[in-house]
């Protein structure tokens, strides 16, 4: 069968930049799905996207579907013919319905019944016939929240459609898509090459558009932007901040990218750089530049959509536009300094945290008491912890945070520094929100760790205390993410404390506000322990490793983590699979038989294999017990791995369930001793091979 290259392009008014990449990928996926469902084979489907177009290149696609046979089932053979072999009324009705004669009938086996059927030859439909509907269906299925209809069109799309190209090699496929007749005419850059571009062949698409100042390939356009931005940054010994989302958005805004470096007045560098970066990135779509120390430099890079003969005009225009933005940030920053952080508590007293749990000032005072209590665990200075907690939420009332909400905490750090607070206090104000997401950094200061823990615990316990725990997809206070943050803060700072101890400390701050302390405690502890799975699955830890540790229900997150790491290491050992299987066998035996009281009686060991296992247990126990006491579980399991050979020999040569009651009891005690050594770390019997 012959193969073809097909080009499809949908030309539109400017598409939403934040959706362009998603629309391209969805169009590609939906088209691939449609081709597969139609039985049209192809080598690849390449997808392109630029501000005014979505396009696909389908390589080596079949010219038509393969011819097939469709089976139409009739009555059972037994019911199809009478005693003389003539068609019954049932068969005659079937043939009449299909418009066929007896000569065209076939039979097939349906289970134990042989049935009559008609095998109809079905000629495959052509690519030209099938493709327009496949593409239209793909467009209809795109993830578009709000569609619009242009005045002259009966169809809807995310933006008004202006032209459609549908080429099979060098031939136009006759079709109407999105109420536009397909052709071989596309259009170049709106300003550099606004005239029509006629495509002679589907393979000419990318080259023809580049001549018309359009880079249709999204990744190529993006790589060009990255190269240009890096070159401009290198020229001033700086590094560009290039967030992935911003890079995608800028790539979606331009057809012919030209990066330009501009400047702003150095006086604005006195403003918190986070505010300047936020306004330049979010509002202006600029790339900011920093030096080797991470300090913002008085430059920014804009990506223009035109290749100007006088780029200075574009640069000056952008400098003029950004100046008021930076001036606003400077104004807010200076205005805020007129009111000390501590004096803002009155405003916090009028800001509701949660209707039943009080104001933000109520929360601040609870956090302060909790932070003082936690200081003995985190090693923070209690006075620093209390002061930082009372100042922690004050910047929420500031002008700067009002304009840039993402600067909460960060603004507080700047103001605290200006007011002369020590490093522990000032840095804690920004660190209180860390970690913000999975894999985010943790607070560097002990005070920051203390406030971050206190804030999260206060919220979690309070919300559980008023019966508003997360349910299903509803988690308005982001308690699931917060719980993982609590676990990370404990584990990665090596805080030796149980979850219940922390919950109890947080409960003390609520007093009578929380009516049922016992239920709240139980629910909050269970919730936090339930987040272990999400935390460790993000790290790639297998579920059976978690189950092995959870079987022991460790109370301390730090202890839990050490056990997880130990089991994770253990399962990489060559002895692990055999020892896990042996432990499972031991667990099954002990589950069916009550372990007799007392210790193993050495004199009652009669088989060489059981004597050898006992001797190994006696030798390894005094080595392992100090390791367990030191919570060096990895070393403990590594030592226990040496028991594989004597355990295997024991099960090969010893009958545990001996007829002699004394021998049986002694062997059960021996297995219990073995089992207890392993379960002092984890229940390795649940590990899969």
Swiss-Prot record:
Q: What class of enzyme is it?
A: ligase
A Pfam family hit: tRNA_synt_2f
PROSITE patterns in UniProt: AA_TRNA_LIGASE_II_GLYAB (PS50861)
Its EC number(s): 6.1.1.14
Q: Give the keywords, sorted.
A: Aminoacyl-tRNA synthetase, ATP-binding, Cytoplasm, Ligase, Nucleotide-binding, Protein biosynthesis
Q: Catalytic activity, per the record?
A: tRNA(Gly) + glycine + ATP = glycyl-tRNA(Gly) + AMP + diphosphate
Keyword NAD on entry: no
Q: Name one GO cellular component term.
A: cytosol
The record's section on InterPro entries has: DALR_anticod-bd, Gly-tRNA-synth_bsu, Gly-tRNA-synth_heterodimer
Q: Which GO terms describe its biological process?
A: arginyl-tRNA aminoacylation; glycyl-tRNA aminoacylation
Please list the GO terms describing molecular function. Answer: arginine-tRNA ligase activity; ATP binding; glycine-tRNA ligase activity
Cytoplasm is among the record's keywords: yes
- The main place the protein resides is cytoplasm
Q: Which residues form a coiled coil?
A: none
Protein origin, superkingdom: Bacteria
Q: Where in the cell is it found?
A: Cytoplasm
Give the protein family.
Belongs to the class-II aminoacyl-tRNA synthetase family.
Relate the assembly described in the record. Tetramer of two alpha and two beta subunits.
User: What is the designated name of this protein?
Assistant: Glycine--tRNA ligase beta subunit
Q: Which gene produces this protein?
A: glyS
């Amino acid at each position: 069968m012959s193969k073809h290259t097909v080009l499809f392009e949908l030309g539109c008014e400017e598409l939403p930049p934040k959706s362009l990449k998603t629309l391209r990928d969805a169009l590609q996926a939906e088209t691939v799905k449609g081709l597969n469902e139609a039985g049209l084979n192809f080598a690849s489907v390449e997808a392109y996207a630029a501000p005014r177009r979505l396009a696909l290149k389908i390589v080596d696609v079949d010219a038509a579907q393969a011819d097939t046979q469709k089976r139409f089932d009739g009555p059972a053979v037994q019911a199809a013919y009478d005693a003389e072999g003539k068609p019954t009324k049932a068969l005659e009705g079937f043939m009449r319905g299909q418009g066929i004669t007896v000569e065209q009938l076939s039979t097939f086996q349906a289970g134990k019944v042989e049935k009559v059927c008609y095998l109809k030859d079905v000629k495959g439909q052509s690519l030209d016939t099938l493709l327009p509907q496949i593409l239209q269906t793909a467009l209809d299925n795109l993830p578009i929240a709000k569609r619009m209809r242009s005045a002259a069109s009966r169809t809807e799309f995310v933006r008004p459609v202006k032209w459609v190209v549908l080429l099979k090699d060098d031939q136009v496929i006759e079709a109407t898509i999105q109420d536009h007749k397909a052709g071989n005419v596309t259009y170049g850059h709106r300003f550099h090459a606004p005239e029509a571009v006629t495509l002679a062949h589907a393979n000419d698409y990318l080259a023809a558009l580049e001549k018309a100042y359009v880079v249709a390939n999204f990744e190529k356009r993006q790589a060009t932007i990255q190269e240009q931005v890096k070159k401009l940054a290198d020229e001033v010994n700086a590094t560009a901040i290039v967030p992935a989302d911003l890079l995608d958005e800028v790539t979606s805004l331009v057809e012919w990218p030209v990066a330009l470096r501009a400047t702003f007045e150095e006086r604005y560098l006195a403003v918190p750089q986070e505010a300047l970066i936020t306004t330049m990135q979010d509002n202006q779509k600029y790339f900011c530049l920093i030096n080797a120390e991470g300090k913002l430099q008085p430059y920014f890079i804009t990506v223009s959509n035109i290749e100007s003969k006088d780029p200075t005009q574009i640069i000056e225009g952008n400098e003029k536009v950004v100046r008021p933005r930076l001036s606003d940030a400077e104004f807010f920053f200076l205005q805020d300094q007129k009111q000390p952080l501590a004096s803002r508590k009155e405003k916090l007293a009028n800001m509701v945290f949660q209707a039943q749990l009080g104001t933000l000032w109520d929360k601040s005072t609870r956090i302060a008491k909790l932070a003082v209590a936690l200081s003995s665990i985190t090693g923070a200075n209690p006075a620093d912890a209390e002061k930082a907690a009372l100042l922690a939420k004050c910047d929420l009332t500031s002008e700067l945070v009002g304009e840039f909400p993402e600067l909460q905490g960060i603004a507080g750090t700047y103001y605290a520094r200006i007011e002369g607070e020590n490093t522990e206090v000032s840095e804690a104000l920004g660190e209180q929100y860390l970690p913000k997401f999975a894999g985010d950094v943790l607070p560097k200061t002990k005070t920051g760790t203390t406030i971050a823990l206190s804030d999260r615990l206060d919220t979690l316990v309070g919300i559980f205390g008023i019966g508003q725990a997360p349910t299903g997809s509803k988690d308005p206070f982001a308690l699931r993410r917060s719980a993982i943050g609590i676990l990370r803060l404990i584990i990665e700072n090596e805080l030796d404390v149980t979850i219940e101890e922390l919950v109890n400390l947080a409960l003390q701050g609520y007093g009578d506000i929380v009516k049922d302390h016992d239920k709240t405690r139980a629910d909050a502890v269970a919730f936090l322990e339930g987040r272990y799975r999400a935390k460790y699955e993000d790290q790639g830890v297998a579920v059976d490793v978690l189950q092995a540790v959870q079987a022991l229900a460790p109370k301390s997150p730090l202890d839990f983590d050490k056990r997880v790491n130990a089991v994770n290491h253990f399962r990489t050992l060559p002895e692990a699979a055999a020892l896990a299987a042996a432990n499972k066998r031991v667990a099954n035996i002990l589950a069916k038989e009550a372990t007799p009281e007392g210790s193993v009686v050495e004199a009652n060991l009669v088989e060489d294999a059981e004597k050898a296992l006992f001797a190994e247990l006696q030798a390894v126990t005094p080595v392992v017990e100090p390791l367990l006491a030191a919570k060096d579980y990895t070393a403990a399991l590594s030592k226990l791995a040496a028991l594989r050979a004597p355990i295997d020999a024991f099960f090969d040569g010893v009958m545990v369930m001996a007829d002699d009651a004394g021998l049986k009891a002694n062997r059960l005690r021996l297995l219990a001793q073995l089992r207890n050594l392993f379960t002092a770390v984890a229940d390795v019997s649940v590990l899969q091979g």
